[in-house]
Amino acid sequence: MSAQNTQTGGDKSRRWYSMLKLACLSAGFFLTIASYTVVRELKDSVFMAIIGKEYVPWAKIVSLFILIPAILLYTRLVDVLRRSHLLYFYTIIYGLMGFGFAYFLGHSSIGLPNTDTGPYRLFGWLFYFFIDAFDPFVVCVYWAFANSISSPKEAKNTYGIMIAFSKLGGVASGIMAMLFLSRVIKIPWLVYGDVVNHQFLLVAASFIILSVPLVIQFMMRVVPGYLLHGYEAVYRAEKRRARDVSS
């Protein structure tokens, strides 16, 4: 009888932690897509204001070549970092860089206040490439992390919910940005203007993406380890990598 009660309690505990894991993964993806939705809308507007709309096709072409060394760096990091640490790395880097770009958007000569457009303005190109790489190096890294801690059966049962939350994140951040720009949502101390609007939205998106590693770290600490590995090959590789780092 006691063995049966123990098994029942174990099943309830497993279900609880599985639900907590799903909630954390869904919340993290909600925040990731919420941030991406905001910055994606800033990419072309900032580039056209600084460089010029006629150079947008060139930016798309050059971006493909810029991604090559970034992908090579990613493949190297995959070999030395665990999937969770890789996610922390990219979300923190993007959050901090977002603050830096937000600051320089208001710079009198580098940023938006300078209305002289031209291809020689390096900041506009850097901003475009920075936002363009968000999808492959943040969104895709998040999926890689989720895959590494989810079995195929679990993925089949839970990924639909995660995607639904990501859609909600995109819709919610888009609506909030629209309400802010239309002055429905007003911040008393903020001096409104095109430059400040861009800066505020980028700072908000940066704060959102920086909250993702906090959610994932909470999940990694609370959810038992036996629920945090999926594909066995990936799990064994992660264990070997952890031993190599500790030694």
Labelled PLM ranges:
Residues M1-S26, K53, P57, V80-H85, ...:
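Intracellular loop-helix junctions on the cytosolic face of multi-pass helical membrane proteins
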Residues R15-V46, L126-F130:
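Pair of pore-lining "gating" transmembrane helices in MFS-fold secondary transporters
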Residues L31, V62, I66, F130, ...:
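Small/hydrophobic positions within alpha-helical transmembrane segments
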Residues T32, I66-L67, I93-F104:
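A generic, lipid-embedded transmembrane alpha helix
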Residues L42, L73, V138-V141:
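Transmembrane alpha-helix boundary/hinge residues in polytopic small-molecule transporters
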Residues V46, I50, V80, F145-I149:
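Helix-to-coil boundary motifs at intracellular loop junctions of multi-pass secondary transporters
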Residues F134-S151:
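Intracellular juxtamembrane helix-capping segments at the cytosolic ends
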